[in-house]
Regions:
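Bacterial N-terminal signal peptides that target proteins for export
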Residues: 2-12
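Bacterial N-terminal signal peptides
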Residues: 12-20
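Eukaryotic scaffold repeat domains enriched in small/polar residues
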Residues: 25-363
Length: 363
């Protein structure tokens, strides 16, 4: 996968990196959120040419203007207007789905209709520890719940429709769909489980051919990102991001344990853009690092929380190209918005940070 854009960014920014790196459903009726005017925050900062801009943050129902009745109808009413401890993210059809183990469910922000709701179903659909989620194009919801030892399934209106489980040790920590397959990370058995999307039947294990000491062995596979060509997996137990082809061949790894440039302390969520740039959030550094498809560090953004744009125990990152219209108003007028980078923070005042990949407006 050729990545000329990533290489260009790397040349421009690598000097800057070395100089600064060390340093469920119940809802509410709310007044329309007030837009906070803050100075534009760019990455890298001036005098370097910026490639990212911090746009805004979301921490609760005050970001949108009205409440849906869906959650009250389905779940009864426990009013929770603020996110507690958000983790996983999925963004589909103008709706941002946020796994929040702190409420035992999800927050759903419908930007198209300015609605905020808490999704905390009961009975067979009750969640214990919703960690990550995936929402398909039909708005069917898949929740990786290690507390239940299952991936829990819901239809587009929030009805519980089933589960994916394993007869062996099963602790699903992330879930993704690519084509007709459901991919699930399972740290308990050092591999991924792959299922048929339509039948929900088990197909195969991914990574089982490797043993301890092998480069491709997964000590604690926690998060994943699937592209047309490759699969990236966060191996939390080996402090690396591991790269495989779709057939399961190990290709390379990114990073190692340490506090230096391009290393990791607590690597968590990962995401890829269309040019092959890999985003990795690190709960230890409290930032996100960007790598090209050769594993070379390009830049980082965020940092321990001091103000807007910073992070506080970040957990997940997603890249989105389809919902730009809701955030263009935050972009500095000198720049165009290419796509969104969304990061969840488990602590601090800014729970969900929205960043934009930007490029200068051509005169």
């Amino acid at each position: 996968m050729k990545n000329t854009r990533g290489s260009t960014i790397g040349v421009i920014l690598i000097i800057s990196i070395f100089s600064v790196f060390a340093t469920s459903c119940a809802s509410f009726l709310h007044k329309k959120a007030k837009t906070k005017k803050i100075a534009s925050v760019f990455y890298p900062p001036s005098p370097d040419t910026p490639h990212l801009q911090y746009l805004t943050s979301i921490s609760g129902s005050d970001f949108v203007g009205k409440r849906t009745k869906f959650g009250t109808f389905i779940l009864g009413a426990e009013d929770v207007s603020q996110m507690v401890k958000p983790y996983g993210l999925s963004f589909t059809n103008g709706k941002l789905y946020i796994c929040d183990p702190g409420i035992g469910g999800l927050e759903i922000i419908d930007l198209k209709n300015n609605e905020y709701s808490n999704f905390t179903p009961g009975s067979n659909g009750q969640m214990k520890s919703p960690l990550n989620c995936y929402v398909d194009k039909n708005e069917f919801l898949y929740v990786a719940d290690p507390g239940r030892h299952e991936v829990v399934l819901y239809d587009s209106v929030g009805n519980y429709i089933g589960k994916i489980a394993d007869t062996g040790s099963f602790k699903p920590t992330d879930v993704a769909i690519y084509g007709d397959e459901i991919w699930v990370t399972n740290p308990d058995n050092h591999r991924l489980n792959v299922y048929d999307k339509h039948t929900k039947q088990f197909i195969r294990y991914f990574g089982e051919e490797f043993g301890p000491g092998d480069d491709g062995f997964l000590y604690s596979p926690y998060n994943l990102c699937i592209t047309a060509d490759v699969i990236y997996i966060t191996d939390f137990g080996d402090f690396k991001i591991k790269k495989y082809d779709r057939a399961g061949k190990f290709l390379s790894s990114i990073g190692s344990y340490g506090t230096g440039v391009g290393q990791f302390v607590r690597p968590k969520g990962i995401a890829c853009d269309k040019d092959g740039i890999l985003y990795v959030v690190d709960a230890g550094f409290e930032n996100a690092q960007m790598f090209n498809d050769k594993g070379q560090l390009l830049m980082f953004f965020g940092g321990p929380y001091k103000g807007p744009g910073d992070m506080w125990l970040p957990a997940k990152v997603v890249v989105d190209y389809d919902n730009l219209e809701y955030f263009k108003k935050y972009v500095d007028p000198k720049y165009n918005l290419n796509y969104l980078i969304i990061v969840s923070n488990q602590y601090g005042p800014d729970k969900i940070n929205i960043y934009g990949s930007i490029s200068p407006v051509k005169n």
